[in-house]
């Protein structure tokens, strides 16, 4: 039986539009735009297209702060992914996307379809996906549910990425109690493209057919975008129908077929876009709106895998592995023949019109007819009230945290056992990071590196964000996230080019949360301007709260850099006994927001570590110069756990040791001061390296040793640790916690 849909009168009087996600004022605005009351289908279209997830209605004023232009930018925000120029007619397309709410409800499918969606965003631009990264947040690994979420999310990422044949080469994971009921799953995809092949998501040319390609439409994921735009509750776990189910093998076929169309039929392809959040309504209305055109869709022609689907369900379904193409009139047969070779369905479901209306026809009747710009462009924009949280001033005035360091080696071991610091090998070993055989630096170093076939170049890539610093001070923390990403790229031999941002925050209707969003954007913008890394794509995920408890502000920074010559590739691990160890940067007693403060105090508080962007940029440029001149054997940025953790990590891979004398007291061994790098150079390169760095705060600490022992001295203080012991703790912590 067909579903009986509510009448316009019932929608208004019973306020059914509220259940669908529209406020009273938004419903009134829709009525005024249409000059009448919307029917059920139209109400659904507006509710999903005006959700935060699709319209950015709460975050647009903040997003306008970001610098988005630069000579390296080929495509900025507004399309499926951003693209930067790497020379020789090549570009790199990349974007990060969140799938947080679905991953709490159905962690395997939530994570898997997050991967599938971001891959489609990248190949819809005309780029071949060459790598995946992720940024994950979970609660502490002390409850069965947290362990279950970690295992299932990682399995979902691996299941989809491994099956489709795209290597998962890097990422980051942090564990904090605020993520227990609000896990974050951010996936980033990087693709390679010839600049001449860049596509747009547009439907233009009056009478041109619009084609639906890929999997059939089912009832999965209806209102997924609205679901991602509201606060969570315990009952939210029941919303499994709003989570989509993915098929990576179908996506692999879709990827190859779409790239074939772009390569061989670019003369007849007008536009291409994936069906992601809000499914068919979002992709089709956006494509028409961007081109200043209208659209007429015949819902009877939409491939359906379930019986009696209504236009409402077909338009809002978020079934996976579907694309929308606009092609030139008279060429449908060629496109269908190509998709046919891949065993994929490709059908005409509508055409471009010149009236700027979005018209939906079903069984010969017009079931929706609304201005296309009203859906895709004209959602109301809210300037939310913003209030500094009381904690911020308290943190500014608080006395700095001083750690208890009676036994330095014991503290060292405890830190290396913390899951945020410990080796993530247990996680990344589940990912195929060598498929396609271009991965030059595998997971576990500062940045992942993928070779560009047919050239001497490589792409460095990383995801970063220490959300604890943002909790203390969102502006400083936002800048640190960008600076750390750039540090990771530089340490690997790359020049930072641009970022994609995954802005994960709590409920923006709370003024304190909106303040966090604004301040984080200010910090990110300042760092991007200083480091010349414009924001070229991104994603906003708000309402990451459950039962009123929100997450730390977590703007994940995905950064891509260019390694101009494969010879410049540098990793974090010491290479040779006898190499000279240097520390670049100043160490202060900065423990607020640190892993050690969390460990010893059970919570974080106080003033965030300082960041001087001018100094940061100078150190990065000098280090990159030294790397490009072939002077650097290893390079590692100092992050969580500070110098002590970075030094230990540098010894682990080759089973080496270190004998160093540091310029700071041993109680600062685990300080998290910013803008610091641990570097090793061959003795014959020491003089030239020192000359490059001579005006800066650079310290010659000592040498790499052949024995598996670390000796650290400061004046009369000395501490010795076995790297074998440290490594076994570091490697064993996560497998042990997940048991």
UniProtKB/Swiss-Prot annotation:
* Binding positions (Mg(2+) 2): 121, 274
Q: Name one GO molecular function term.
A: ATP binding
Quick one: which residues bind substrate?
Answer: 98-101, 120, 244, 318-320, 541
Query: Catalysed reaction(s)?
Result: N(2)-formyl-N(1)-(5-phospho-beta-D-ribosyl)glycinamide + L-glutamine + ATP + H2O = 2-formamido-N(1)-(5-O-phospho-beta-D-ribosyl)acetamidine + L-glutamate + ADP + phosphate + H(+)
Q: Where in the cell is it found?
A: Cytoplasm
Residue numbers annotated as active site: 53, 99 (proton acceptor)
Positions that bind Mg(2+) 1: 97, 539
Cellular component per GO?
cytoplasm
Instruction: List the EC numbers from the record.
Output: 6.3.5.3
- Where does the protein principally reside? cytoplasm
List the pathway annotation. Purine metabolism; IMP biosynthesis via de novo pathway; 5-amino-1-(5-phospho-D-ribosyl)imidazole from N(2)-formyl-N(1)-(5-phospho-D-ribosyl)glycinamide: step 1/2
Transmembrane parts of this sequence: none
Q: Which InterPro entries match?
A: PRibForGlyAmidine_synth_PurL, PurL_linker, PurM-like_C_dom, PurM-like_C_sf, PurM-like_N, PurM-like_N_sf
User: What do we know about how this protein assembles, alone or with others?
Assistant: Monomer. Part of the FGAM synthase complex composed of 1 PurL, 1 PurQ and 2 PurS subunits.
Q: What does this protein do?
A: Part of the phosphoribosylformylglycinamidine synthase complex involved in the purines biosynthetic pathway. Catalyzes the ATP-dependent conversion of formylglycinamide ribonucleotide (FGAR) and glutamine to yield formylglycinamidine ribonucleotide (FGAM) and glutamate. The FGAM synthase complex is composed of three subunits. PurQ produces an ammonia molecule by converting glutamine to glutamate. PurL transfers the ammonia molecule to FGAR to form FGAM in an ATP-dependent manner.
State the protein's name: Phosphoribosylformylglycinamidine synthase subunit PurL
Q: Which organism is it from?
A: Listeria welshimeri serovar 6b (strain ATCC 35897 / DSM 20650 / CCUG 15529 / CIP 8149 / NCTC 11857 / SLCC 5334 / V8)
């Amino acid at each position: 039986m067909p579903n009986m849909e509510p009448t316009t009168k019932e929608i208004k009087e019973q306020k059914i539009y509220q259940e669908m996600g529209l406020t009273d004022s938004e419903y009134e605005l829709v009525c005024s735009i249409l000059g009448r009351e919307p029917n059920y289908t139209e109400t659904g279209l507006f509710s999903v297209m005006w959700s935060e997830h699709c319209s950015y209605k709460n975050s647009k004023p903040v997003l306008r702060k970001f610098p988005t232009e630069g000579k390296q930018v080929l495509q900025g925000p507004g399309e499926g992914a951003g693209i930067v120029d790497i020379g020789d007619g090549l570009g790199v397309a990349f974007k990060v996307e969140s799938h947080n709410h679905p991953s709490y409800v159905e962690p395997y499918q939530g994570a898997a379809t997050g991967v599938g969606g971001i891959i489609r965003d990248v190949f819809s631009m005309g780029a071949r996906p060459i790598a995946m990264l992720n940024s994950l947040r979970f609660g502490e690994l002390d409850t069965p549910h947290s362990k279950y979420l970690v295992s299932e999310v990682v399995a979902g990422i691996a299941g989809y990425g491994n099956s489709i044949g795209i290597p998962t080469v890097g990422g980051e994971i942090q564990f904090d109690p605020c993520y227990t009921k609000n896990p974050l799953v951010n996936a980033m995809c990087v693709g390679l493209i010839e600049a001449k092949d860049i596509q747009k998501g547009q439907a233009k040319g009056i009478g041109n057919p619009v084609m639906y390609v890929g999997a059939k439409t089912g009832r999965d994921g209806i209102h997924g975008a609205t679901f991602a735009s509201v606060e969570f509750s315990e009952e939210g776990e029941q919303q499994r129908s709003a989570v989509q189910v993915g098929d990576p093998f179908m996506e692999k076929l879709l990827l190859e077929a779409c790239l074939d169309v772009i390569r061989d039929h670019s003369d007849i392809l007008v536009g291409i876009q994936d069906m992601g959040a809000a499914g068919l309504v979002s992709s089709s209305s956006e494509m028409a709106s961007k081109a200043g055109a209208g659209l007429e869709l015949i819902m009877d022609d939409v491939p359906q895998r379930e019986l009696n689907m209504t236009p409402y369900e077909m338009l809002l379904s978020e079934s996976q592995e579907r694309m929308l193409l606009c092609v030139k009139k008279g060429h449908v047969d060629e496109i269908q023949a190509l998709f046919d070779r891949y065993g994929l369905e490709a059908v005409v479901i509508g055409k471009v019109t010149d009236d700027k209306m979005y018209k939906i026809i079903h069984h010969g009747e017009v079931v929706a007819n609304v201005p296309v710009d009203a859906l895709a462009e004209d959602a109301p924009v809210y300037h939310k009230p913003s209030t500094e949280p009381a904690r911020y001033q308290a943190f500014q005035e608080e006395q700095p945290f001083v750690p208890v360091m009676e036994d330095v080696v014991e503290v060292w071991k405890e830190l290396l056992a913390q899951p945020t610091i410990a080796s993530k090998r247990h996680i990344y070993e589940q990912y195929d990071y060598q498929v396609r055989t271009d991965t030059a630096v595998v997971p576990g170093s500062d940045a992942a590196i993928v070779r560009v076939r047919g050239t001497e170049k490589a792409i460095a890539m990383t995801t970063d964000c220490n959300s604890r610093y943002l909790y203390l001070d969102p502006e400083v923390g936002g800048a640190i996230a960008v600076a750390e990403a750039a540090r990771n790229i530089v340490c690997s031999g790359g020049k930072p080019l641009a970022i994609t941002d995954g802005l994960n925050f709590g409920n923006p209707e709370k003024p304190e949360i909106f303040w966090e969003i604004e301040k984080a954007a200010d910090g990110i913008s300042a760092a991007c301007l200083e480091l010349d890394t414009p924001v070229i794509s991104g994603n906003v995920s708000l309402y990451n709260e459950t039962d009123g408890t929100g997450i730390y502000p977590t703007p994940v920074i995905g950064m891509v850099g260019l390694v101009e010559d494969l010879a410049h590739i540098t990793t974090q691990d010491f290479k040779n006994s006898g190499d000279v160890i240097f520390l670049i940067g100043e160490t202060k007693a900065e423990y607020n927001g640190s892993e050690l403060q969390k460990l010893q105090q059970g919570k974080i508080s106080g003033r965030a570590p300082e960041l001087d962007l001018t100094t940061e940029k100078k150190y990065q440029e000098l280090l990159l110069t030294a790397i490009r001149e072939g002077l650097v054997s290893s390079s590692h940025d100092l992050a969580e756990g500070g110098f002590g953790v970075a030094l230990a990590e540098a010894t682990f891979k080759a089973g080496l040791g270190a004998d160093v004398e540091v310029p700071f007291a041993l109680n600062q061994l685990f300080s998290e001061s910013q803008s610091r790098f641990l570097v090793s150079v061959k003795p014959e390169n020491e003089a030239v390296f020192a000359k490059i760095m001579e005006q800066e705060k650079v310290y010659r600490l000592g040498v790499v040793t052949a024995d598996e022992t670390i000796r650290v001295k400061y004046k009369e203080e000395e501490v010795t640790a076995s790297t074998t012991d440290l490594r076994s703790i570091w490697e064993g912590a996560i497998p042990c916690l997940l048991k």
